[in-house]
Amino acid sequence: YEAIDLLKGMISRPSFSRDETAVADFLQAEWQKAGQKVFRKGNNLWIIAPDFDFGKPTLLLNSHIDTVKPASGWTKDPFTPEETEDDQLYGLGSNDAGASVVSLYEAFCILSEKEQPYNLIFLASCEEEVSGKNGIESALAELPPISFAVVGLSLIHISEPTRLLS
């Protein structure tokens, strides 16, 4: 399945905050192979749906590609994606926030297949874990005005699962 393979590709590349180039290069190449026109500023990547119309409101789908460095408690290689017996994907960034990036990208692709009453922009931002100056704020300055957004962390129950949920 392409989405799982994309997530595995993200996991297998170090993407620590302020050093996300390897994963940004990988995602840009994969999305371009899929026919997407990918825009880039630093390690921020975005795609604008082809039927963009300034007369419509704009929905931003956003999650981040950076991770924290692995803590000492890891019992397996954090950069070797592994599917567990209970269909979980193990690896650094699989949960925070690779799964969100892949899920929101897939949603963008599906929604972009037909005209919507709103514009769609998908943004995979960097430096979220450190609130870096080269992250989402620098990317937003390059985008058309955003009316509303689905952000991985804001909709935690949908796109960034944590232990806070039961």
Summary of predicted features, one role per range:
Residues E142-L155:
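A glycine-rich helix N-cap at a beta->alpha junction
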Residues A139:
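Substrate/cofactor-recognition hotspot
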Residues A22, V102, N134-G135:
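Generic recognition of short, well-ordered alpha-helical segments
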Residues I156-S166:
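Single conserved hydrophobic/aromatic residue that forms the stacking wall/gate
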Residues D5, Y118, P144-I146:
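Structured loop/turn residues at beta-strand edges in well-structured enzyme cores
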Residues I65, L123-S131, I136, S154-I156:
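Acidic, glycine-rich active-site loops and adjacent beta-strand->loop/helix elements
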Residues Y1-P70:
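N-terminal helical capping/dimerization or prosegment-like subdomains
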Residues K56-I121:
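Active-site metal-coordination/substrate-binding segment of hydrolases
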